């Protein structure tokens, strides 16, 4: 999708490493320690591949998928030991050969309709062996109510980014931000403007979608309680669900 393509350079440079450096110890504690050595892992909405690189370095066999070509271009450079494919979480199809799956950095909040979230869970379940473990994080109501409206600016000599117009509609449950980006390329400034949207799902909606998709046991963990400090952890919950045998 174009909005994620335009955002990929900034995401790769400023956000992916920061988030996944904080998230990886949590994933080790609640999910990775339960997997067999050399497990095959599906990384859904893999972004620029920072998590895939960490997993591959631990000996896991990783397949990443993302809807953005530009994100995947960075992912292939960042994690050459992993495999990547262009696909939408709500419509991909892979054979059930994975031992585990993961989706991080509130990626599943970007699915704006409950039917799309359930479809993503169904697709993930179809890609997992019986008993396979899915780990993911999502932002819940606290995150959108308390910090979503904050503006942000990042200014460097050859690039800048602003986040403005942040809004959360408590009726539709849709949150939006406007991202304006400039990069100095070959002596000329290039501008991109994108709108990024997320949906705030309730814990009940998430658990119901998982159950409908064929997942059983569900464990929930507050990110702050697991050591994810500051805004990264605020209003964020990690989930681990197992596919029914």
PLM features per residue range, with description:
Residues 135-208:
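SAM-dependent methyltransferase
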Residues 104-106:
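Residues lining the SAM
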Residues 118-130:
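A short glycine-rich, Lys/Arg-flanked "PGG" loop and its adjoining helix->strand segment in the class I
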């Amino acid at each position: 999708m174009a909005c994620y393509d335009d955002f990929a350079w900034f995401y790769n440079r400023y956000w992916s490493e920061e988030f996944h450096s904080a998230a990886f110890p949590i994933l080790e504690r609640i999910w990775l320690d339960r997997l067999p050595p050399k497990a095959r892992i599906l990384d859904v909405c893999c972004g620029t591949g920072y998590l895939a690189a960490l997993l591959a370095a631990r000996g896991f066999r990783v397949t990443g998928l993302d809807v953005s070509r530009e994100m995947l271009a960075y992912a292939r450079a960042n994690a050459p030991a992993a495999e990547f494919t262009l696909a939408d979480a709500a419509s991909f199809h892979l054979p059930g050969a994975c031992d585990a799956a993961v989706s991080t950095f509130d990626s599943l909040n970007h699915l704006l309709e409950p039917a799309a979230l359930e479809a993503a869970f169904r697709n993930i379940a179809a890609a997992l062996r019986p008993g396979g473990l899915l780990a993911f994080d999502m932002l819940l109501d606290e995150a959108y109510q308390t910090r979503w409206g904050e503006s942000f600016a990042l200014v460097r000599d050859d690039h800048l980014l602003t986040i403005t117009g942040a809004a959360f509609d408590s009726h539709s449950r849709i949150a939006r931000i406007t991202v304006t980006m400039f990069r100095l390329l070959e002596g000329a400034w290039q501008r991109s403007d994108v709108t990024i949207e997320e949906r705030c799902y309730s814990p009940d909606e998430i658990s119901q979608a998982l159950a409908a998709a064929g997942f059983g046991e569900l464990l929930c963990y507050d990110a702050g309680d697991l050591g994810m400090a500051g805004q990264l952890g605020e209003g964020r919950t990690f989930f681990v669900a197992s596919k029914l045998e």
